[in-house]
Structure formats: C-alpha cells, structure tokens
C-alpha cells in the first residue's frame, strides 16, 4: 500500500481539496479506499472547459455539455446533505434555469460559504430567492460575459448577515433598488465589485462604513439620464477604489479619508470633449459640460491617496478644474493612461500638485495636442518649457506601450532634460507594435543607440525592456 493511501480519510480529503472536482473524481479508480472519497471533499470546483476542446463538432460539444451537467448532478447527489464550504461552477455555455436553481438551493441548504457562478445566464433569468437570504454566504461571485444579471426584484427582503465579498460582473447588471438601500443588507461587507452596473436613477450614493478592502464600480450609466446628476461616496474606511462611470454633474459628498489607492475612469464622448475644449463663452448656461468642473470635489475627497491612476478621459475632464486642483501631499505613484484623441491639459497641474511624487507611469506617450497642452510635453514651443517638470521630485518614470517613434523619443528627451531628480527610466515596448517601424531592425538599432547615448549624457539609468502588463481597470 502506498503512503498516501494509508493516510486517514480526512487528510486525504484535505489533499483532494486542492484539486478540481474532475481531478479528484479520477482518484476513485485507484483502489477501493479511494472510491467516492472525493464526495467527502467540502469544496466543489466544476468547470466545463475541462471537458471541451476547440476541434470538437457542435454535436459533440452538446453531448459533452450534457455529460458535464449530468456529472454535476451525480456529484451533488453522492454528497447528500453534508456541509459544503465552496461551490464554484463555470459553465459558459449555460445551464437550464430550473436545473441551476435546484443546484443552488441544494448547496445553500448545505451551508455554502463561498459561491462562484460563471455562466451566460439566459435572458430574464432570476436567481433563486434563497440566495438573497442565506445566513452562511461569506463570498459571492456572479459573472456572465454575454448575459445579463438581474438582482432579485424583491431585493428589499435581501439580508446576508455574513457576506464579506460581493463580486458581480456582466455585460449588464440590473438592480431594481437603489444601491444605498441595498448596502445595509450586507452588514459586514468589506469588498464590493460591480461591473456593468446600470444605476436605477441619476442620483447615486454609496454609503458603507464596513467597506475596507476594495470598492470597484464600473457603470454603464443611468436609466433616466445620460450622465448621472450626482454621485456620492461615504466610505470612510475604504482602502482601494476603482471607479469607472460616465462623469457626473456633481459629487456632493466624497468621504474617503482612509483611501490608499484610486483608479478613476470618468467617461465622456467626443461631442462633450469638443465642447469642453471650446471657449467658455461658447457654451450655453445650461450646458452639462459646465458642471463637469465639479469633478474637483471628487478629487478633493480622494486627496489622501498614495497611488493615483487616471484614464485618458479623466484627464480631459480634469482640464475643467486645473486652477482648483487639490494638492495630493501623499501621492507617491501617479499613473496616466494616454490616447491619441485625448489631451494632456491637466498633466502640468497634476505634476505641480504631487509634491512628493516618486514614480510616474505612462501607458503610452501619445495625446491630442492643443494650445492648452501645458509644458509637460514638448509639442508646442514655450519660453517656460518644462516648468511643471522642473518642480517635480519624481525619481522613476515608467513608459509602457513604447511604439518606437521619434516623437516618443523627443518626449523622452524632454523628460530627461527637465525632471531634476530622475534616477531611473524604464521603457517597455508595445507587444503588438502598430507603427510602420515596429519590426524594422534598423530602427531598433537606432533606438538602442540613442538609449545608450542617454546613459552617457544623463545620470539617469535608462532601460529598454520587454512588454509588461497593461492598464488594469480593476
């Protein structure tokens, strides 16, 4: 007898808990001692992708999916009513609603604490009521890449007393109640991630003192207006914020005094950007973009952060409040995502107002050139060239998505000339370079020669590196 087989059942079950349910089920053929031992494991990890292969025909795939669903049914039946800690089901081809609800009710009755569903839900599918009143759920994750997730229409009866983490991600998330009414239903929640959320009205409030680890909100807008009328945050103990939404007309309350990290995407369309760039006297008194300057209230509310990451659309919105930009005394890391059609008007104000900045990261060195571009770039000649850079104490500059163009090289030289405390510059090449010189070895050699010259001319350590991870909205 092998040493593992001689171990007690509870020890072998613990070993099996590190495997997927399919892998642990395969151990049943080892010997009688292993037969159906996997049914005692309190964690179920069921994934249809382990059964499917791209080369299979449609008929074969349907047959295999039916076999997978039958396997899930058998496993739950063999386990009986024993306690279960985790139930993870990934079936992106979908599950018949009646069957899925039967499984969910079964694991909820057995006291599941960690529930994960990655399924393309059918149109109109509603999760069972039992899920919204579970007394054992600690972590709940719902993901549907192409389908829509409907939070239970009777959500006023929701109460999940132990839920600490709620993660909902979908093409569209519908909730028939206001978020501020729903959050009290989770009295100990620490992490909230809602991706694809549609606000029920145009006034949004996120108020929760227990949120600490993370708040990720990615909204598709409001049912009643294009841009939210107001968005408020009262989360005094929150450490990490990732917020993506259409820019609101007002941010009347932003209480995030404990915030350590913020990633902000404030969406605007091309027409709104054109109006923001126009002279103020060209705008009517009731033009919504006049009120976009209220974004300064959001920035003041998060000004204690140490890590701040801003999307290219956000930079355009911030151009409406450059004069009133708050000072970010604690910011050590500033990240900027660039785009050809979005301007850098706000970048000089940001650099001036981060007096203790240590690391500056650009994802892309491209931007739309305007007469308000400021002195952070060298696109337009100015007598005070590089003034905002010369007052910036940044020590490390990271440049991602480098596309091997001379325009980028000129901007890199501009940084090297004007950042007085710069010690290190890391340049990461674009993985799929769209530029005409992306695969030209002569251009590569020229760029490498220029970078070697920089090392001789400047005290800064300049490195050309392989591609790295790109902007992460979460």
From Swiss-Prot:
Residues 1-62 form the F-box domain. It comes from the Eukaryota. InterPro entries: F-box-like_dom_sf, F-box_AtFBL13-like, F-box_dom, FBD, FBL60-like, LRR_dom_sf, LRR_FXL15/At3g58940/PEG3-like. LRR repeats lie at residues 140-170, 171-196, 220-245, 281-312, 339-364. Keywords: Leucine-rich repeat, Repeat. SUPFAM superfamilies: F-box domain, RNI-like. This is F-box/LRR-repeat protein At3g03030. It comes from Arabidopsis thaliana. The lineage of its organism: Eukaryota, Viridiplantae, Streptophyta, Embryophyta, Tracheophyta.
């Amino acid at each position: 007898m092998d040493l593992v087989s001689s171990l007690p059942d509870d020890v072998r079950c613990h070993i099996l808990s590190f495997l997927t349910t399919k892998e642990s089920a395969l151990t049943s053929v080892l010997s009688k001692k292993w037969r159906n031992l996997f049914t005692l494991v309190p964690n179920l990890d069921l994934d249809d992708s382990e059964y499917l292969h791209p080369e299979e025909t449609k008929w074969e795939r349907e047959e295999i999916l039916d076999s997978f669903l039958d396997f899930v049914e058998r496993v739950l039946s063999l386990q009986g009513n024993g306690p279960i800690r985790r139930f993870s089901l990934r079936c992106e081809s979908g599950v018949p609603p009646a069957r899925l609800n039967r499984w969910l009710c079964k694991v909820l009755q057995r006291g599941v604490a960690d529930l994960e569903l990655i399924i393309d839900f059918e149109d109109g599918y509603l999760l069972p009521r039992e899920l919204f009143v579970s007394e054992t759920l600690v972590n709940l994750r719902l993901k549907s890449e192409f389908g829509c997730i409907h939070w239970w229409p009777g959500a006023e009866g929701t109460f999940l007393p132990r839920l600490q983490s709620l993660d909902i991600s979908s093409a569209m998330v519908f909730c028939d109640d206001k978020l501020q009414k729903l959050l009290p239903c989770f009295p100990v929640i620490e992490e909230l991630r809602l991706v694809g959320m549609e606000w029920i009205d145009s006034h949004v409030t996120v108020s929760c003192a227990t949120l600490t680890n993370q708040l990720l909100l990615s909204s598709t807008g409001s049912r009643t207006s294009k841009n939210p009328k107001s968005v408020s945050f009262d989360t005094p103990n929150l450490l990490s914020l990732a917020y993506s939404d259409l820019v609101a007309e007002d941010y009347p309350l932003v209480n995030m005094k404990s915030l350590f990290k913020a990633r902000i995407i404030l969406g605007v369309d091309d027409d709104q950007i054109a109006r923001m760039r126009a002279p103020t006297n060209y705008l009517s008194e009731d033009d919504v973009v006049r009120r976009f300057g209220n974004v300064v209230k959001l920035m003041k509310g998060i000004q204690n952060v140490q890590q701040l990451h801003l999307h290219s659309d956000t930079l355009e919105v911030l151009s409406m409040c450059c004069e009133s930009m708050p000072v970010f005394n604690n910011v050590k890391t500033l990240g900027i995502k660039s785009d050809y059609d979005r301007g850098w008007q706000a970048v000089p104000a940001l650099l001036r107002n981060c007096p203790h900045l240590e690391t500056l990261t650009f994802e892309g060195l491209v931007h739309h050139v305007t007469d308000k571009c400021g002195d952070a770039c060298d696109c337009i000649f100015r007598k005070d060239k590089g003034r905002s850079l010369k007052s910036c104490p940044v020590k490390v500059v990271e440049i991602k998505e480098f596309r091997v163009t001379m325009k980028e090289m000129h901007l890199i030289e501009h940084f090297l000339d004007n950042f007085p405390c710069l010690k290190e510059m890391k340049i990461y090449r674009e993985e799929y370079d769209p530029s005409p010189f992306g695969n030209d070895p002569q251009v590569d050699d020229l760029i490498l020669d220029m970078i070697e010259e920089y090392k001789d001319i400047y005290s800064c350590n300049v490195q050309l590196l392989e591609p790295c991870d790109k902007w992460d909205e979460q």
